[in-house]
Regions:
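Generic alpha-helical transmembrane segments of integral inner-membrane proteins
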Residues: 62, 66, 70, 74, ...
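Short cytoplasmic-facing helical segments at TM-TM junctions of multi-pass membrane proteins
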Residues: 30-54, 137-140
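Hydrophobic alpha-helical transmembrane segments that form the multi-pass transporter/flippase core
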Residues: 18-19, 110-111, 115-120, 146-152, ...
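Hydrophobic side chains within alpha-helical segments
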Residues: 24, 32, 40-41, 60, ...
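Hydrophobic alpha-helical transmembrane segments of integral membrane proteins
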Residues: 55-59, 148-168
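Hydrophobic alpha-helical transmembrane segments of multi-pass membrane transport proteins
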Residues: 1-40, 68, 125
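Start (N-cap) of specific transmembrane helices in multi-pass transporter permeases
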Residues: 48-69, 143, 147
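Membrane-interfacial helix-loop-helix connectors in multipass membrane proteins
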Residues: 1-6, 74-116, 124-143, 165-168
Length: 168
């Protein structure tokens, strides 16, 4: 269970949750700026709107999502310890021993890399959907929904690819 928590569950589930929350927020924020012509105003002033609006979001998520993945791993392991101890299914010493038995430190690196890749996917897809939104506020909602759906599917595909590439 440690392997599943560290290698697959934490990074993927955190990414899917954040695709829904962060992805929709980014797409709707940038889409609203496009609809209200704020992006056009930036371009008229000579500002590269894509790097000004999107790059800070990508950098922030690529740094922060792996930290959330670490937190998710920690909470999952502590939760497993609490349940095993409180229900009497396992002795606390056995649980701790099982955590360290055949532990590969690369597993943590693997989870952090996946978190960073998923962060880039979520942010770039959501920013793209918002940046190219056209029409009215209904289109912003559609762009936000499209960003979440495409990000979620892409995360699952890249999860498979990264698992095949990085699995030792």
């Amino acid at each position: 269970t440690r392997e599943v928590m560290v290698l697959e569950f934490s990074s993927t589930v955190v990414a899917l949750i954040l695709a829904g929350k962060v992805g929709s927020n980014i797409a709707s924020e940038i889409g609203t700026m496009r609809i209200t012509e704020q992006i056009d105003a930036l371009e008229i002033m000579g500002v590269n709107s894509a790097s000004y609006l999107i790059l800070p979001k990508i950098v922030a998520t690529v740094i922060f999502f792996p930290l959330l993945t670490l937190f998710s791993i920690f909470v999952g392991i502590v939760g497993g310890y609490a349940i095993a101890s409180l229900t009497g299914m396992m002795l606390p010493g056995d649980y701790i021993e099982g955590l360290f038995y055949c532990f590969e430190p690369f597993s943590i690196t693997y989870a952090l890399v996946k978190g960073a890749v998923f962060a880039f996917i979520i942010t770039s897809i959501s920013a793209y959907c918002g940046y190219y939104a056209k029409g009215n506020s209904l289109e912003v909602g559609r762009a936000s929904t499209r960003a979440v759906v495409v990000s979620s599917i892409t995360i699952m595909i890249f999860n498979l690819i990264l698992t095949h590439i990085m699995r030792v």
